[in-house]
């Protein structure tokens, strides 16, 4: 049995994730006038471009909501963001610049907390503003049904009647005006922006063209560091972790992780840290392009990774990164609370993050230009005296020890030469004078 309703369920309670923007405002009013009983739910995610959250539910009531609730999701959002950081759950990167999955994390929190609030009100039909081409329609679908197995989905943007009557922003604005609401469309930007306190996503419209770059974006969490007119002074910042949790910035301890992240955003944002331009594969395997901001998470992640590399051994780091990529993809797909994701996340939190205690000092400059100045931790396994080029007392190994270790390597070197010779005999390899490959013709060098 399908859980998606193609037409408006008149006479029934319908919950809508209400942002207060034109789309959801027109949809709420339209649903009320067509005979549904709309309930509005707004997630407070600490969006940097939202000036007044308390006003949003009031507007929803004006547009016909039976009830309107503001759900504070900030603490849970930051908790999930730090969990993703601890596990390195980021699979999209370009030349070392990372997308911190800030929108997928936000959807995991919104999709569960709003549906839980609806369930408390006896609302078992949910609508939101996601379109059929994007990732969010599937993310919200999964999280909604995980939270409420009796949930039905109604999306105005999948209802042909709604599309025929209010198919565009101009039509929506006129509809609101005729209903007596002086709702003026905001000025059209050259791209679309979605944000929460973890980060911002800029995409669509002009940004669908790869010839349009970061220079057309006006950052909402930082500064346009690519503009020479923007003055940015170098700044030193110290980040402290205790058992994987960020607890202090520049010596100031924060009992509330939300306040710590806000300060990290302010520090990183002054430099434009954490902005990246990514081409990615959506859930449906079509490629899309986005420009992202995440100044606070970027700052914390740099410090966290520095401590990871100084504390853990190579095999642990390799496993952490492999699992992090897998977990990042699951998060992106809307599977953050699936069993395989929980297994990967909790493994990293237990065996990687719990050892991460220490301080890292950085110098931030413009954009993603920074230097690591100092790393301190009681758990460091980095010990410079082990490999010092100077003469040291009680050296951990001697020249004779290294001779023995190198001699043992003869076994795999001989094996490698024999395999290369086999490849030459079968024609897979053809060494030439200009090749860096050893000149193996008869099994001898």
Curated annotation (Swiss-Prot):
Q: In the record, what terms sit under GO molecular function?
A: argininosuccinate synthase activity; ATP binding; protein homodimerization activity
GO biological process terms on file: argininosuccinate metabolic process; L-arginine biosynthetic process; urea cycle
Q: What's the superkingdom here?
A: Bacteria
NCBIfam families associated with the record: argG, PRK05370.1
Protein name per its UniProtKB record: Argininosuccinate synthase
* The protein's Enzyme Commission number: 6.3.4.5
Keyword list (alphabetical) reads: Amino-acid biosynthesis, Arginine biosynthesis, ATP-binding, Cytoplasm, Ligase, Nucleotide-binding
Is ATP-binding a UniProt keyword of this protein?
yes
Q: Which source organism?
A: Bordetella pertussis (strain Tohama I / ATCC BAA-589 / NCTC 13251)
Which family, according to UniProt?
Belongs to the argininosuccinate synthase family. Type 2 subfamily.
The UniProt catalytic activity note for this protein reads: L-citrulline + L-aspartate + ATP = 2-(N(omega)-L-arginino)succinate + AMP + diphosphate + H(+)
HAMAP family this protein is in?
Arg_succ_synth_type2
Cytoplasm among keywords = yes
Mind giving the lineage of the organism this protein is from? Answer: Bacteria, Pseudomonadati, Pseudomonadota, Betaproteobacteria, Burkholderiales
Q: Where in the cell is it found?
A: Cytoplasm
